[in-house]
A protein has these predicted regions:
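Boundary at the C-terminal end of the N-terminal hydrophobic targeting segment
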Residues: 28-32
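Acidic Gly/Asp/Thr-rich repetitive segments characteristic of extracellular carbohydrate-active
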Residues: 38-74, 78, 115-118, 543-551
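Surface beta-loop-beta hairpin patches that serve as ligand-binding interfaces in beta-rich domains
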Residues: 480, 490-567
Length: 567
């Protein structure tokens, strides 16, 4: 108690000094580096040098950190308890938490906190301009803590309670793993357990309409969580004048070059995001049963809900499992202006392409889907129960809440779909103004596609389908929907889980191989902000062949003598 009293007094004194001098002489206080070592430190040290480190995270939390300060945790050490970050940096001088020394990343494990496991190992409430790097964050909660629900757990939790706009988060080179609650929730949709989570409260008035933005999460490794790897959720406001405005969304979110594997649920969720970029990530075995009694056991590499201006490109999704969803990626309901391109998905049992209801302008192009949509109904599943949601190669649904509403302006073109032997995926197309152009559908020997084909109609124009190529046992009912189909014999030779295997030799098409001319739909947010590198219209296929250079235009991409795959 004596040490805490001293720390509290120092914190108050430092805070008063900042109030008195901070606004007048913002550069008068030098930026400081602090060092923390659980193996050799002492909280009575000044913490300013490697030879005089603090020992605990509670000591870190007592210090008033200033913009530009850095707190270094010693590599190879283990820190038990919760890191509470209750100061903000600035745009030019963020506060940084990282590692020093050689060895394994320092471990921050909230689950071992005295008095019971906290909600999150790293907790940030209403603070911004922060950087986290080179830390191993865990929180497998097993001991109850007063005032903390047993059914939630987070590695890093960032909360915006609606006091102001929050900006500037740079989280990189982290390992976030083993994030599980004490007990599971019964409701799938109410389960929010996450490795890295941003949560923004919905506005209760126009004056409190704030959001969180400038979020950059990159080069991290996430695994073993009860549901999400990374999740961003801005609660939807019911206030007129706020609902649907940019203040009702988190803004400018970049999720780049992360690897996420063996999560109980989805690797990445965008819920209420305005301008979101999902690029060069790997989603491996979402819906995994690492801790089946604590997890939702229902995946999808990534999905988007109630969001605007979303780009998902150059991602890989492999091995999603679950009784529902479990696609490589899917567009849930209530989105607008979504571009999904240049992605590779393999062995995701739910769907090859999944787009639910109440969406506007969804563009799905130059993707490769291999052996997706294999889920069977009416058979016992590894997690228990039986699924009533059969696997589908194409799944455009009108599902939304509170009522079903068809999506409109759906463009699915120049994709390659490969259907696995011994699988029998269905097709459902239930939307308005849908376009299926120049896709390549190849069924491996022993497989079948489209035994049941459903096309929904509620009035108006439904389906414009032309220029697609079909190989193998594809339902005549599906082929007949195409006004200009091509039947071919296509085979692939190479590792099934490598995208380059599906770079088609254009000679296999003979003389009927060019598909139909396309007026490309426009991604309206291209060329500016976080989308400055995203073209409004595609300039190349998935294998970086220039579009319009005389190469064929069926499927996601072609092999040619000059083909060089990008990293």
């Amino acid at each position: 108690m004596k040490v805490r009293s001293i720390g509290f007094t120092k914190k108050v004194a430092n805070l008063l000094a900042l109030i008195v001098f901070g606004g007048v002489m913002p550069n008068a206080v030098a930026q400081s580096n602090y060092f923390v070592s659980s193996s050799s430190g002492d909280d009575k040290n000044n913490g300013l040098t490697v030879s005089n480190p603090w020992a605990s995270m509670s000591r870190v939390s007592q210090e008033v950190l200033r913009p530009g300060d850095t707190v270094y945790f010693k590599s190879g050490d283990r820190f038990t308890g919760q890191l509470v970050i209750d100061e903000s940096g600035t745009a030019l001088a963020p506060i940084h938490f990282s590692a020093y020394g050689k060895g394994d990343l320092p471990v921050i494990d909230g689950a071992e906190m005295p008095g019971g496991a906290p909600l999150a190992s790293v907790l940030i409430v209403d603070q911004d301009h922060l950087e986290l790097s080179k830390l191993n964050i865990k929180n497998f909660r097993k001991k109850k803590r007063n005032g903390v629900v047993d059914t939630d757990a987070y590695g890093v939790l960032v909360k915006n309670t609606g006091k102001r706009n929050l900006r500037g988060y740079n989280f990189h080179d982290l390992v976030v793993e083993d994030i599980f609650p004490i007990q599971a929730r019964k409701s799938f949709n109410k389960t929010s357990v996450t490795g890295i989570r941003f949560e923004t409260h919905p506005a209760k008035s126009k004056k409190s309409a704030y959001n969180t933005g400038d979020i950059y999460i990159h080069n991290n490794f996430l695994r073993h969580t009860a549901r999400f790897g990374i999740a961003l959720r801005h609660g939807s406001s019911h206030i007129k004048g706020v609902r649907g405005s940019v203040s009702d969304y988190d803004v400018d979110v970049r999720i780049i070059n992360n690897r996420c594997e063996d999560t109980g649920g989805t690797c990445v969720l965008f819920n209420g995001v305005w301008n979101g970029l999902l690029e060069k990530n790997s989603f491996i075995r979402s819906g995994a049963m690492v801790e089946p009694n604590l997890s939702v056991n229902r995946g999808s590499g990534a999905w988007f809900f109630r969001s605007k201006n979303i780009v998902a490109q150059h991602n890989v999704a492999i091995g999603s499992r679950g009784h529902n969803d479990s696609a490589g990626m899917h567009v849930d309901f209530g989105n607008e202006n979504v571009l999904v391109q240049y992605n590779f998905s393999f062995d995701n049992e739910g769907y090859g392409t999944e787009i639910l209801g109440k969406n506007k302008n969804v563009i799905w192009r130059y993707n490769i889907s291999v052996h997706d949509g294999t889920r069977l109904v009416g058979v016992e599943r590894p997690e228990g129960g039986k699924s009533s949601f059969p696997g589908k190669t194409l799944f455009v649904s009108d599902f939304s809440k509170p009522k079903r509403i068809q999506s409109k302006d759906i463009y699915i073109y120049n994709n390659t779909y490969v259907i696995a032997a011994s699988s029998d995926p269905l097709v459902e197309l239930n939307g308005r103004d849908m376009h299926l152009w120049n896709n390549l559908f190849v069924v491996d020997d022993g497989g079948r596609m489209g035994a049941k084909v459903t096309v929904g109609w509620q009035g108006g124009k439904v389906l414009d389908m032309q220029g697609n190529v079909f190989s193998g046992d594809v339902s005549p009912n599906f082929i007949r929907l195409d006004s200009n189909p091509v039947i071919a014999v296509i085979g692939f030779d190479g590792p099934p889980d490598k995208p380059e295997t599906y770079a088609v030799d254009s000679a296999q098409f003979g003389t009927n191989r060019t598909g139909v001319a396309i007026n490309h739909p426009i991604f309206r947010a291209s060329g500016k902000g976080i989308f400055s590198h995203v073209a409004a219209e595609p300039e190349f296929d998935i294998f970086y062949n220039a579009i319009g250079s005389g190469l064929d235009v069926v499927g996601a991409g072609y092999r040619n003598k000059d083909l060089v795959l990008q990293p």
